[in-house]
Amino acid sequence: MNLKQEVESRKTFAIISHPDAGKTTLTEKLLYFSGAIREAGTVKGKKTGKFATSDWMKVEQERGISVTSSVMQFDYDDYKINILDTPGHEDFSEDTYRTLMAVDSAVMVIDCAKGIEPQTLKLFKVCKMRGIPIFTFINKLDRVGKEPFELLDEIEETLNIETYPMNWPIGMGQSFFGIIDRKSKTIEPFRDEENILHLNDDFELEEDHAITNDSDFEQAIEELMLVEEAGEAFDNDALLSGDLTPVFFGSALANFGVQNFLNAYVDFAPMPNARQTKEDVEVSPFDDSFSGFIFKIQANMDPKHRDRIAFMRVVSGAFERGMDVTLQRTNKKQKITRSTSFMADDKETVNHAVAGDIIGLYDTGNYQIGDTLVGGKQTYSFQDLPQFTPEIFMKVSAKNVMKQKHFHKGIEQLVQEGAIQYYKTLHTNQIILGAVGQLQFEVFEHRMKNEYNVDVVMEPVGRKIARWIENEDQITDKMNTSRSILVKDRYDDLVFLFENEFATRWFEEKFPEIKLYSLL
């Protein structure tokens, strides 16, 4: 297989949703249907000791939530699929945001009873902004929920995107019979004891079956005929531009509708895209010269070895283990001898990868999120990955002063992961951590104790707003007021932490010559 054929066989996507919509369950079932795992265990099965394949971190297994982005690769038909299961909890939107920079499409999971929820909306907007094609899986049809047309209208009106239902449900909840596949005109029954049924071109059942007298069946056929009469053909170009989403109905927990979705996904999802550089150069996935970027760093995937893995998206060319690459930020050459692929925490050495693949590089502290790696004589760097402005700030210290070495090591690694943001006061070197939400601090505290054996003391700073400074050379000590703290971030850039909006406006009016700005 040549490079072009290899690249065309790659499909790389992220799964996005609000917490509890069934995102991680869908991930498990996709792995199950691909043969990557033998048993699709239930995500919530804490009492049985079974945890989702993608929820590998101890805190995730205990709480049943995804707080990091897991990466898994599997083969299906003639395709190699890279799937990223992202954090559903809003406090970890920064990690999710960066993950969405590394994929070529996204799958949006919606709970049929709840419809579009706040976190789904937020993540959808990121996909829309990037023009990422979005596939929609409406989940939990075996429970009572909103009517199909109501859900489609909600998606179209709330998200401003056209919908195209690929299948249609017959009933829901206890009366859920199955789904009608529009393309094959077949009915796939929900219960195993039922056989697949066939419809003719007029949507009449070809077999004798009691369901013809069922009101749910009659309603489903009427609704589907309305959809067909609208006469809109599936527009693949609109999908690829992010203007149309194909919609699939099913139940991930019951393994129903998942394989239909997977079959359609590999048919319609895009192959790896070209990427833009800071130098305004478009890098084609078919370029012979290797390039990639780091979008995530994860410490302690193997707690026994205190390892650090940098997750790299291959953008162009072929990666070969042992090859020499240049880290563009430092302009230093390095030989990559340790590279890995993933099934959550199960790792396997990677000798070869092409555009679209996600691989892990063992990191001794060389890499930062957003780093560009290139082979040959290339000199470009890919565009920076986004960083969120924190909204909560805490002073942090080690409870036991004898644990300072472990304390600083833990903070250094967790900050480099992008799990939390780091600041230091100018004169006292007091460490202040910033986060988007409270759960980030809870996970930080948990990981410091479990992974670094350090109990930490955290104390609110009483500051809510962070503003960076364009013209740092004009900052003086007199600008540090009782309602603000001047600190440095991990890159040694000056940052003001303000008490509230009023304090921010007061500062801007008193010192108009200082140009403040926020991150995302």
Curated annotation (Swiss-Prot):
Enumerate the GO terms in the molecular function aspect.
Answer: GTP binding; GTPase activity; translation release factor activity, codon nonspecific; translation release factor activity, codon specific
Q: Where in the cell is it found?
A: Cytoplasm
Species assigned in the record: Staphylococcus aureus (strain NCTC 8325 / PS 47)
Q: Which InterPro entries match?
A: EF-G-like_DII, EFG_III/V, G_TR_CS, P-loop_NTPase, PrfC, RF3_C, RF3_dom_3_sf, RF3_GTP-bd
Give residue ranges for domain tr-type G.
Answer: 8-277
A GO biological process of this protein is: regulation of translational termination
Regarding protein family, the annotation reads: Belongs to the TRAFAC class translation factor GTPase superfamily. Classic translation factor GTPase family. PrfC subfamily.
One GO CC term on file: cytosol
**Record-linked PROSITE patterns:** G_TR_1, G_TR_2
List the protein's name: Peptide chain release factor 3
Main location class: cytoplasm
Function comment:
Increases the formation of ribosomal termination complexes and stimulates activities of RF-1 and RF-2. It binds guanine nucleotides and has strong preference for UGA stop codons. It may interact directly with the ribosome. The stimulation of RF-1 and RF-2 is significantly reduced by GTP and GDP, but not by GMP.
Which of UniProt's keywords are assigned here? Cytoplasm, GTP-binding, Nucleotide-binding, Protein biosynthesis
Q: Which gene encodes it?
A: prfC
NCBIfam families of this UniProt entry? Answer: prfC, PRK00741.1, small_GTP
Q: What is the lineage of its organism?
A: Bacteria, Bacillati, Bacillota, Bacilli, Bacillales
**Can you tell me which residues bind GTP?**
17-24, 85-89, 139-142
- Quote the Gene3D superfamilies the UniProt record gives: P-loop containing nucleotide triphosphate hydrolases, Peptide chain release factor 3, domain III, Translation factors
Report the superkingdom from the record: Bacteria
**Protein's UniProt keywords contain Protein biosynthesis:** yes
